[in-house]
């Protein structure tokens, strides 16, 4: 890389890379140097240069220029590489209209420039209109989104009202879940979770069917009238539930079909296909509607029948009440009638009851049963008559045991109370004696002079005081000991009672599951459900309905039950497993299928269980007291797991101590130890999961929702205030851009406001539901809450349902429109052929960051190209070379030049007048003629070349190259002569009239500079570049810093990077204002300037000081080849 003096007086280094030298001539170098100089000068002037080290105040995300590399391709196309820090924010630098100001022209603009200006103005207008249209579309889309959010918030408010109006918690849950379901685009969720819904419906349907079959068998048997009415009532209720499930299923099918139609119309299909598909779906919908109408009528009929049966049951209840009033002597009959009354009440008012009322009613039934059995034992009526009734009497015995335990409990309590009364009695008497002793002591003090009379009294009083003290201490100790022991015994009894109750319920369930062949046990559905209800109540965790749903959805529960069991056994085992009280494990032998209790009933709590808990926990319907119960239950579980860990560790230690050297025993011990290790690992994993779950629950319990609510309200208030300020009352219609901008601001802030309102409504829903449940708890004993609430409000649930349906339809329509607009946008991106050229230009401007920079640099080169002296010289030389190549002459006289310009035609126009028909025929007939011609031409060329030039390998290669070129030229001429019909199309290649114009076009192609690409390369470490270090040294020298300190600092900065192996800095000039100029240099590390392979980065800069110019040179030796991206 040598240096040349520029004609304008600048010293410029030739920056032409080696790749350009293969096709560029030497006379083009001055032009390249001049262009490089212009580009570098403009870029370094207008872009901020990287300077090290950066100050603390400076923003490190700012884009700064490190280095420029200019590469040239064929026909003077320029590629510029800009090495920049943080190129992500580079678009801010290139937003200016022009980086460089072109010099002013004294002469006026030409016609071509005027036309260009007109076209630019037209294109700008088109762009503005296009931008306005795009902004309008976006605004419409945002408005749709705002409408959807508003409607969803309205819907959530109405849903909360409905939840308050509904009586039971189950309806609350259903409505609440449905509202959430609607908010998430109901149809899309149904289509996505289509198999899941079908599975749930199928499970419910199968359970209902099996129960109906069992009750049908029961009705066919010879039973009493009362029992038949009871079973009919159950049968009709189940039928009604089944019809509801079927109607829901039909509704799901309809929604799915509608969604299919919407999706099919969205695709790019023909009208015939769409119409055919529409017809098929319409037929399906018609059938589904007919079925739904049929089932609705059926459900109405069932409700009417149920009302009539209910009236009959009420009459029977009245008769039983009258019987109870009449019966005053027989206690057994009285208890039986009381149980029947309570059962009828339970049946009739099951749907309207609160959970607490149901529990109280069940407890009353149990108490009456206990009294009844007690009376039976006193009478001596309980006797085992047959083997079939043995189980029944065993259950009675268990009940008697329970009664005995409760009696003993009562006795203990009475003992404690009696002792308490006796203690109080003794205390009162002791106080009286104390008063008498005090009176005696008072007398002694008064009549102390008569010692003979009161001598014995003194000793008596002292003895009595000591006795009273002993009595008090003994009584206190006895009471404490008795109280502790009795309380401990009572606690043991209560635990025993609860375990016996649970076992009894589970035994009854297992009895029905085991004896599935007998008809009696198969039919006792009511018994089964009572027992299940008791077990369900005993377990604290299973009280949450969402947990029950999550477990029933799992399919692995069905695998635990063997295939040979009946439908009822499967249902019962599923229920028992879901309740998580104990796990039924059947023996491995297929012949004997006996249920066995598994002690490790907590094995059901797997990882999936915890994930389901977390999903349940996210649900808003979960309340504070429920989460508290969950927390307590999980804490107990964790303690159990810790104990289990300790037990396993102890077992492993014992086994290790018991291992013997014998092979037989050793293997068994090793296997058992391995199994225990596996169980220990699984247990530790489960403990970790439980701990995470407990932390989540603790957060839920401790978090304060009130603060979040207040924050949301404050944010909404701020948004309202801002909107009132920013939007004026009157908007000007002339300025469209400003109006659209204001509308955008208004809509965006309103969308944000609606989202915040949705969050606030969700919080309020949870609070309202929690308060409702508390209120129900408080007032459940006095009167049912649902009736009292309905009396206060005039709103009906029917009207609410209608309004919710209307809102839902409206939301679905708006969401469909919104989705269609999104689909159109995606389709517009894929299809590029329909776009106009203006839109294509708009897209390009969005994609490329450096388009504006490229255009400004191109204009700069164009203006300097027209006026510079160096470009004219290179242009003249290129022009002359083209003329010589095409066979023209450089200098002509006036007459000859005019003749040349008038006579000259395209080289292919002369071929039209020649007759090539004979040649064409000869070439087509003789296939070997072309090969022979080529061989002869080759021989002629070889003969022309001297023999001396054919010695070396290189000379042979060059000779072959020239031969190939000449043969190609010959073949082209042959092809033109043979295909004389295509000569007219070849005329358009050179669309010029004169020879001079053709030469000008070719010179423009070769010499006119064109900026093709501007590539931005990210620089991670600017310390690795010599340019940055040189800039740093120059800046410090200009600020009058000492040159040695600046050199040291620059070398430290460079050597701190791993890539740099060595640095050399040289400063020459009047250093520190000395009269004689000198050079100072500093070297750190290795800088091998003589080796060609060494990767050395060099830069030269000048510092302009008061005493003159100082030259700064920096050499950097890098370990690896230059890689700007590293």
Swiss-Prot record:
Would you say which domain of life the source belongs to?
A: Eukaryota
Known Pfam families for this protein?
Answer: Ribosomal_S3_C
| Record-level GO cellular component terms | chloroplast; cytosolic small ribosomal subunit
- Swiss-Prot/TrEMBL GO biological process terms: translation
Task: Kindly provide the name given to this protein in its UniProt entry.
Answer: Small ribosomal subunit protein uS3c
PANTHER family (alphabetical): 30S/40S RIBOSOMAL PROTEIN S3, SMALL RIBOSOMAL SUBUNIT PROTEIN US3C
On assembly, the entry states: Part of the 30S ribosomal subunit.
What's one GO MF term for it?
Answer: structural constituent of ribosome
Cite the PROSITE patterns for this sequence: RIBOSOMAL_S3
* Protein keywords: Chloroplast, Plastid, Ribonucleoprotein, Ribosomal protein
The similarity comment for this entry is: Belongs to the universal ribosomal protein uS3 family.
Compartment(s) where it occurs, according to its Swiss-Prot or TrEMBL record? Plastid, Chloroplast
Q: Which organism is it from?
A: Stigeoclonium helveticum
> What are the start and end residues of every segment in region (Insert)?
89-881, 943-1013
Principal subcellular localisation of the protein:
plastid
Q: Which HAMAP family match?
A: Ribosomal_uS3_B
